[in-house]
Amino acid sequence: MDETLAEFFRRTILKIPMTEMMTILKTWNFLSENQLQTVNFRQRKESIVQDLVLLCEENRASLNDAAHLDIICDDIDLFDMEQFKSSFKKILQRALKNVTVSFRDAEENSVWIRIAWGTQYKKPNQYKPAYVVYYSQTPYAFTSSSRLKSNLPLLGQALTVASKHHQIVKMDLRSRYLDSLKAIVFKQYNQSFETHNCTTSLQEGSLGLNINMDSRIIHENKVEKERVQRVTQEIFGDYPQPRLEFAQYKLETKFKSDLNGGILAEREEPLRCLVKFSSPHLLEALKSLAPAGIADAPLSPLLTCIPNKGKNYFKIRDK
Amino acid sequence: MSALRPLDKLPGLNTATILLVGTEDALLQQLADSMLKADCTSELKVHLARSLPLPCSVNRPRIDLIVFVVNLHSKLSLQSVEESLCHLDAAFFLGKVAFLATGAGRDSHCSIHRNTVVKLAHTYRSPLLFCDLEIEDFRAAMAQRLVRLLQICAGHVPGVSALNLLSLMRGSENPSLEDL
């Protein structure tokens, strides 16, 4: 077997954690039971790997077999859930004596973590726990808003270290609906969930009105209406929007006015202003603004970029 | 863009056409549906437009009554109506124009003061009607009323013309010129 191929085997097998070694080798099914029995799995990892590579050479392993092994390694979840949980719990308990941490495994390789925070002198408050959902296959975790904001850095640190990442970044994305947050963050929102008849005319597609239009009603601005529908559909798509309740814009921009003069127009410093949009279903409401005639189409990109950017809290400054 | 003139076309047989102008399409659509459900001996046609001037159209029938719908919750709707009024032939204001203000019931949502629309209607010497179009019963009642106005403006009611109607309506609802 040539040098580079042997090296490739060595490195691939070295990457496999010992806990998964037997499972992966059996799934690969390249080395026979007898051959595996000849390897002493109690020695140091480097020696085990060396023995396995020699066996591969004996079997005249080809590049295809190596590629096959590589695929299997990627396929099997090499993330060690138990290790994550124990590491996470240890970090919190070392920092804060009074804390209760519990776990529940859920679907899609996720783990729900319940944390009851205490302080140095007080027992953990079981009535106001914080919840975290961590999806191990992704670099994302979702937390419920904890009343004790001071514990957030510690929580962040515990998550980072236990999941073997380097740093944690807080996203400016908040909602009460976990599924919507997941849809935005995992970019799964732009899939239609229902079969859609693509030949539906634009009029029937709008807001549920005009389904059986009376021929005695005539829309004078049909062309404009269709343009608005088309632009709205291009921006928002046909699919149901993820559910958010707020969009908040913190403005720190200079005051601009059409009126000449005025006290505010002469200010050099930026004017601090907060604009907050709230709705039971913000994105659907924004989608319906132009077709309802309340706003012009296309809408401001500050509003339409929310799912794309994964943000609903913005800070805007003059450039 | 053609200017709308009240008498430049021949009327259709027993047909009355109303034009509703307003920015909020959903409200106009609902009002149109309510009007068509109302009792009426004439054949009704309802045209909906966002603003004036209207796009060019040879097939448009003669417009007998124009109602400008202003949503008191939206400054944009008032602004759009004000801009549209400039594109209307003066002859329309002899009884063939009315203003309809909606949203007065929810005072906390109103960004336009009631007096603003009152002044607007007075400036154009046309009647002003108030109705919360979102409430079905009120809308149905207003629709019935508009149908009656429309029939008079189309000349389907013997003995009453649009101009008569104007002076009749002014007495009961709108303050006279001296009061404002």
Curated annotation (Swiss-Prot), chain B:
The keyword Ribonucleoprotein does not apply. Its main location: nucleus. Keywords: Centromere, Chromosome, Cytoplasm, Kinetochore, Nucleus. It is found in: Nucleus; Cytoplasm; Chromosome, Centromere, Kinetochore. GO terms for cellular component: cytoplasm; kinetochore; nucleus. It comes from the Eukaryota. It holds the Pfam family CENP-M. PANTHER family: CENTROMERE PROTEIN M. Component of the CENPA-NAC complex, at least composed of CENPA, CENPC, CENPH, CENPM, CENPN, CENPT and CENPU. The CENPA-NAC complex interacts with the CENPA-CAD complex, composed of CENPI, CENPK, CENPL, CENPO, CENPP, CENPQ, CENPR and CENPS. Component of the CENPA-NAC (nucleosome-associated) complex, a complex that plays a central role in assembly of kinetochore proteins, mitotic progression and chromosome segregation. The CENPA-NAC complex recruits the CENPA-CAD (nucleosome distal) complex and may be involved in incorporation of newly synthesized CENPA into centromeres. This is Centromere protein M. The gene is CENPM.
